[in-house]
Swiss-Prot record:
It holds the Pfam family Turandot. Induction: By a variety of stressful conditions including bacterial infection, heat shock and exposure to ultraviolet light. Residues 1-21 form the signal peptide. Coiled coil: none annotated. A humoral factor that may play a role in stress tolerance. GO terms for cellular component: extracellular region; extracellular space. Keywords: Immunity, Innate immunity, Secreted, Signal. The gene is TotB. It is found in: Secreted. It comes from the Eukaryota. GO terms for biological process: cellular response to heat; cellular response to UV; innate immune response; response to bacterium; response to heat; response to UV. Belongs to the Turandot family. This is Protein Turandot B.
Length: 138
């Protein structure tokens, strides 16, 4: 490739990366959403249904995390997704699976524990990014 073509490719790559970054507005919105999810999820079925939304928020923020935070969260998530059983069978979709079926009491307990720990971890990370803003915006 000639120099001009290489320069254009590099510029496009750089611009694309900058445009797809996780902005402060998105972080604040996700911080408020995690707080709302945790505050309004009272029963087990609601918690289980909202696991997917928490995982979506994590997937959006994961590239912005420090490598040690990301590794810790990935280990945490993969550890739980293997334990959650749907109708007595391990979920095949991993972390992206939406838990729609009725769960046994033991699986429901694992899933709600996962919801609580995941929500608390996400809230902790998001709060560390905006320590003064999270409570004021509510």
């Amino acid at each position: 490739m000639n120099f001009k073509t290489s320069l254009i490719c590099f510029a496009l790559l750089l611009i694309g990366t900058l445009c797809s970054a996780y902005s402060n507005q998105e972080r604040q919105r996700d911080s408020r959403r995690v707080a709302e999810i945790m505050r309004t999820s009272w029963d087990d079925n609601t918690k289980i249904k909202r696991i997917q939304e928490l995982l979506t928020i994590y997937n959006r923020m994961a590239p912005s995390l420090r490598p040690d935070e990301r590794a810790r969260m990935d280990r945490f998530i993969s550890g739980y997704t293997g334990e959650i059983m749907v109708d007595g069978v391990p979920s095949q979709g991993g972390a992206r699976r939406i838990f729609k079926k009725i769960l046994s009491p033991a699986a429901k307990s694992v899933a709600t524990g996962f919801f609580t720990e995941l929500g608390a971890s996400l809230a902790s990370i998001l709060t560390s990014w905006f320590p003064a803003n999270t409570e004021r915006n509510h």
